[in-house]
C-alpha cells in the first residue's frame, strides 16, 4: 500500500471532462476600459466590470467555462470570444455586484 501524502490528489487515468451536460454558450467580449480586467472561474459573468461590453442578457446565470481557480484577463482594447457555462445546483446568485441576489428563475 502506498503512503498517502497530505494534500495529495489522486485522479483516475485519462482526461477529466468539466461541466458535462450543462448549458453553454460562446460570447464576444470587448474591454472598452483603460485598465486590465481579470475575471475568475466562478464569477457571475452577467455582473462583471461594466467596461466589458457583451450581451449581458445571454450571460445571466453563467460563468466562465474554465477550470476552478483560473481566470481570463482582458487587456484594454482586447476583444475575444469566451465560453460560458450555466450555474448548477439551486441556481441562486448572491453577492457579486448585487444585480441578482436571489433565484435566477
Swiss-Prot record:
Signal peptide feature range: none
Record has Cytoplasm as a keyword: yes
MF annotations from Gene Ontology: urease activity
Keyword Cytoplasm: yes
Enzyme class, broadest EC rank: hydrolase
Pathway(s) the chain acts in: Nitrogen metabolism; urea degradation; CO(2) and NH(3) from urea (urease route): step 1/1
Pfam families listed in its UniProt record: Urease_beta (PF00699)
Catalytic activity: urea + 2 H2O + H(+) = hydrogencarbonate + 2 NH4(+)
GO BP: any one term: urea catabolic process
Enzyme Commission number(s): 3.5.1.5
Keywords: Cytoplasm, Hydrolase
Location of this chain's protein in the cell: Cytoplasm
GO cellular component: urease complex
Quaternary assembly: Heterotrimer of UreA (gamma), UreB (beta) and UreC (alpha) subunits. Three heterotrimers associate to form the active enzyme.
PANTHER family, per database record: UREASE
Family of this protein: Belongs to the urease beta subunit family.
Name the UniProt record assigns to this protein: Urease subunit beta
Organism: Synechocystis sp. (strain ATCC 27184 / PCC 6803 / Kazusa)
Record gene name: ureB
Amino acid at each position: 500500500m502506498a503512503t498517502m501524502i497530505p494534500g495529495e490528489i489522486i485522479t483516475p487515468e485519462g482526461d477529466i471532462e468539466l461541466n458535462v451536460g450543462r448549458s453553454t454558450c460562446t460570447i464576444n467580449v470587448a474591454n472598452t476600459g483603460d485598465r486590465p480586467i481579470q475575471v475568475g472561474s466562478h464569477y457571475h459573468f452577467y455582473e462583471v466590470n461594466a467596461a466589458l461590453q457583451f450581451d449581458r442578457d445571454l450571460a445571466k446565470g453563467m460563468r466562465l467555462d474554465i477550470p476552478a481557480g483560473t481566470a481570463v484577463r482582458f487587456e484594454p482594447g482586447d476583444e475575444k470570444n469566451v465560453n460560458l457555462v450555466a450555474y448548477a445546483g439551486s441556481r441562486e446568485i448572491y453577492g457579486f455586484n448585487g444585480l441578482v441576489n436571489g433565484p435566477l428563475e
